[in-house]
């Protein structure tokens, strides 16, 4: 169809060019024929000019229309080419579709066979899955039993080791406890002996000084014993008490001599209570600032009235019994030395 249209356009163009040639030839022949008639006839230039202009206009219009027709033909040609390509694709697709439609029955048979095989495979998979689940349960049970046995063995070993450690620890604690009890008994006895000895010496010294001079000089303080560093009796208040204003020394000497003759020991406090008019004793207690400024001294004043307590201390030393309360008391004294000093001070004041 496109080729026929192109042939027609070419034929029209050839006819148009041949017509133009014939027209030009005829005009030339008319000019040649009209030349010999120049003499008898006068030329009409205006008519020829009009005719020529009309021919030119006609030729220009024809040329323009021919050009427009050529452009339209090219456009139609391109569209026809595109349409032909499109319909060619459609034709090929229709041919393929026809072939595929012809293959549909075989495809349906294949699909049916695949469905049957899939159903068979599904049943097989279900059976295999059930067997795998059963196998997994068996494996889990075996693993659980194995872990139970391992944990049981580990627990038994742990119990045995802990029993051994507990027995060893108990034995060690028993030995340490027995050793500490013996040490504490020994240290307590040593402390009691040192305390008794210390108070006896202090009392003897103070008594000798009192018998020789008739009064106590507390200002002359003795250095504390090194062995009494852990059990010093803090009796600073009693140490700083001073006997002042002894107006009647002779009555006191008579009292002491009479006490020595009768072999009886009478407390000076009782003597003062019985004869307040004869013996006037003033106890002067210094201020806390003075006591703080003065250095601590040995507890010599506490032993002035300790003669009657010496047998009691010896009895306590003989009847010492160490128990758990003594152990805790010793540990508390070690942890808080200030508290132990206070307790020793209280004991000393009670003894006084």
Swiss-Prot record:
Keyword Endoplasmic reticulum among record annotations: yes
Residues the record lists as Phosphoserine modifications: 11, 340, 343
Membrane-traversing stretches: none
Post-translational modification: Ubiquitinated by TRIM32. Ubiquitination leads to DTNBP1 degradation.
Compartment(s) of residence: Cytoplasm; Cytoplasmic vesicle membrane; Cytoplasmic vesicle, Secretory vesicle, Synaptic vesicle membrane; Endosome membrane
Biased composition (Low complexity): 286-301
Compositional bias of kind Polar residues: 274-285
Membrane topology type: Peripheral membrane protein
Keywords: Cell membrane, Cell projection, Coiled coil, Cytoplasm, Cytoplasmic vesicle, Endoplasmic reticulum, Endosome, Membrane, Nucleus, Phosphoprotein, Synapse, Ubl conjugation
Highest taxon in the source lineage: Eukaryota
Spans annotated as Disordered: 267-352
First-listed, main subcellular location of the protein, grouped into a coarse class: cytoplasm
Positions in coiled-coil regions: 92-180
Any GO BP annotation: memory
Positions of short motif Nuclear export signal: 243-256
Primary role: Component of the BLOC-1 complex, a complex that is required for normal biogenesis of lysosome-related organelles (LRO), such as platelet dense granules and melanosomes. In concert with the AP-3 complex, the BLOC-1 complex is required to target membrane protein cargos into vesicles assembled at cell bodies for delivery into neurites and nerve terminals. The BLOC-1 complex, in association with SNARE proteins, is also proposed to be involved in neurite extension. Associates with the BLOC-2 complex to facilitate the transport of TYRP1 independent of AP-3 function.
Subunit description: Interacts (via its coiled coil domain) with KXD1. Interacts with AP3B2, TRIM32, CMYA5, PI4K2 and RNF151. Interacts with the DNA-dependent protein kinase complex DNA-PK; the interaction phosphorylates DTNBP1 in vitro. Interacts directly in this complex with XRCC5 and XRCC6. Interacts with XPO1; the interaction exports DTNBP1 out of the nucleus. Component of the biogenesis of lysosome-related organelles complex 1 (BLOC-1) composed of at least BLOC1S1, BLOC1S2, BLOC1S3, BLOC1S4, BLOC1S5, BLOC1S6, DTNBP1/BLOC1S7 and SNAPIN/BLOC1S8.
Similarity comment text for this entry: Belongs to the dysbindin family.
PANTHER family: DYSBINDIN, DYSTROBREVIN BINDING PROTEIN 1 DYSBINDIN
Protein name: Dysbindin
Lineage: Eukaryota, Metazoa, Chordata, Craniata, Vertebrata
Designated gene of the protein: Dtnbp1
